[in-house]
Curated annotation (Swiss-Prot):
Positions of the UniProt region annotated as C-terminal barrel: 249-419
Protein name: Bactericidal permeability-increasing protein
Keyword Glycoprotein applies: yes
Disulfide bonds: C125-C164
CDD domains attached to this UniProt entry: BPI1, BPI2
Known role: The cytotoxic action of BPI is limited to many species of Gram-negative bacteria; this specificity may be explained by a strong affinity of the very basic N-terminal half for the negatively charged lipopolysaccharides that are unique to the Gram-negative bacterial outer envelope.
Glycosylation positions in this chain: N352
UniProt domain comment: The N-terminal region may be exposed to the interior of the granule, whereas the C-terminal portion may be embedded in the membrane. During phagocytosis and degranulation, proteases may be released and activated and cleave BPI at the junction of the N- and C-terminal portions of the molecule, providing controlled release of the N-terminal antibacterial fragment when bacteria are ingested.
Taxonomic path: Eukaryota, Metazoa, Chordata, Craniata, Vertebrata
Source domain of life: Eukaryota
Family: Belongs to the BPI/LBP/Plunc superfamily. BPI/LBP family.
GO molecular function: lipopolysaccharide binding
Organism: Oryctolagus cuniculus (Rabbit)
InterPro entries named among the record's database cross-references: Bactericidal_perm-incr_a/b_dom (IPR017943), BPI/LBP (IPR030675), BPI/LBP/Plunc (IPR032942), Lipid-bd_serum_glycop_C (IPR001124), Lipid-bd_serum_glycop_N (IPR017942)
Region (Central sheet, part 2): 184-248
Length: 445
């Protein structure tokens, strides 16, 4: 309800401005002035000076969407009037106070199946005006007593019909375009985009408004459905924040699939990429401390490590935390004097990392920390050797060089599916089984 109240506050501010733009047509008619017969009056230059909406509310309307209700609204209308009977002409200014205005409207929420875009329409609207009071600013105000009831009734009926017209129009011309700022498909880089389209119409219940988004990465050049399905999510019922966003492991794992298939996880390391202060070096001399045959066969040469991810990394979220596993092939080469490469060995690396996910500027950001690293010798051109001899070097290379580069990219952030100008604050992130739950308050501006 806190989120609905804030949305109500923002929406009613827009509606108020639109209602104050109502154009009221001139009102003309005849009146009787005994014993002199009939006269004519005309009310013109009518302007809505203020339209106050003091008690707005938005409530959930199950199976429809939202119900907007406003009570005790009041309107001030100003203008000019003139009356004539024979050679007698009078004119002046007037104020009309319209009080006790009540408005009720249902906003039906839906979606366009072909695009997954959210829609909102005004499915019903009614308004009622309790009373209208006419006051003249001229010394001829007594003339108004001859026809004030007709004017009050006419202007009350006019305002009654205009209110729902304006509300319905505002929903289609203001609210719907704003809803359309919810991102559908957003290209992130030359490789991937993210699909946030709706997979079903929004669903209103007695205590929540739920939207199911696809939450899937896709290859911008060759989009294709992933070979796995999203896991079910048992989302807890929480009400401390305005909105809650459940982010399934499916989102992150489709990202891993797309980037791995595009070859974006490849990385080449050379000695000049190792921190200068480090004792560990990518040279045959340093490698020869663990593998003497390397230094003998390729003396005083630099070493190149080429890393490629052999299968998509897999992220798993549990209440205890977030883990990511990856299988990496590491090919080691000696760089010969003519800059050609001589293959040394091929290792298979199984990485177990812990992941921290946070937020920055309305984006999800991540950071990986190396946990356990398991080595396997897949092929060797320098003879067989125990892979444990390279454990310390590989731990260092992964922790000091590879993961910092990965984390640098993860800090660029993943945009959250928020409409335009919505900012999040008071964020809280909770890991659950197979999904991450983000709770936040929102502000517009």
């Amino acid at each position: 309800q806190k989120g609905l109240d804030y949305a109500c506050q923002q929406g009613v501010a827009v509606l108020q401005k639109e209602l104050e733009k109502i154009r009221i047509p001139d009102v003309s008619g005849k009146f009787k002035l005994r014993p002199f017969g009939k006269g004519h009056y005309n009310f013109h230059s009518l302007v809505v000076r203020s339209f106050q909406l003091p008690n707005p509310q938005i409530r959930l309307q199950p199976n429809v969407g939202l119900r907007v209700s406003i009570s005790n609204a009041n309107v001030r209308i100003g203008g000019r009037w003139k009356a004539r009977k024979g050679f007698i002409k009078v004119r002046g200014k007037f104020d009309l106070s319209v009080e006790g205005v009540s408005i009720s409207a249902d906003l039906k929420l839906g979606s366009v199946p072909a695009s997954g875009r959210a829609t909102v329409t005004c499915s019903s609207c009614s308004s009622n005006i309790n009373r209208a009071r006419l006051r003249s600013q001229a010394s001829w105000g007594g003339w108004l007593k001859l026809f004030h009831k007709r004017i009050e009734s006419s202007l009350r009926n006019t305002m009654n019909s205009k209110i729902c017209q304006v509300l319905t129009s505002s929903v289609s011309s203001k609210l719907q375009p704003y809803v359309e700022t919810l991102p559908l498909k957003e290209r992130l880089d030359s490789v991937a985009g993210i699909d946030y389209s709706l997979v079903a119409p929004p669903r209103a219940t007695a205590d929540s408004l739920d939207m199911q988004l696809k939450g899937e990465f896709y290859n911008v050049a060759r989009p294709s459905p992933p070979p796995f399905m999203p896991p079910p999510m048992a989302i807890p019922s929480l009400h401390d924040r305005m909105i809650y966003l459940a982010i399934s492991d499916y989102l992150f794992n489709t990202a891993a699939l797309v980037y791995q298939q595009a070859g974006a996880f490849g990385l080449t390391l050379r000695d000049d990429m190792i921190p200068k202060e480090s004792k560990s070096r990518l040279t045959t001399k340093f490698l020869g401390k663990a593998l003497p045959q390397v230094a003998k066969m390729f003396p005083n040469m630099n070493v190149q490590l080429t890393l490629s991810v052999s299968s998509p990394p897999h992220l798993t979220t549990r209440p205890t935390g977030i883990a990511l596993t990856a299988a990496v092939d590491l090919q080691a080469f000696a760089i010969l004097p003519n800059s050609s490469l001589a293959s040394l060995f091929l290792l298979g690396l199984k990485l177990n990392t812990s992941a921290k996910i946070g937020t920055k500027a309305d984006k999800l950001v991540g950071e990986l920390t190396l946990g356990r690293l398991i080595l396997e010798l897949k092929h060797s051109n320098i003879g067989s050797f125990p892979v444990q001899l390279l454990q310390a070097l590989m731990d260092y290379v992964l922790s000091a060089v590879v993961l910092p580069k990965v984390n640098e990219k993860l800090q660029r952030g993943l945009p959250l599916p928020m409409p335009r100008k919505v900012q999040l604050y008071d964020l809280v992130l909770q890991p659950h089984q197979d999904f991450l739950l983000l709770g936040a308050n929102v502000q517009h501006g």
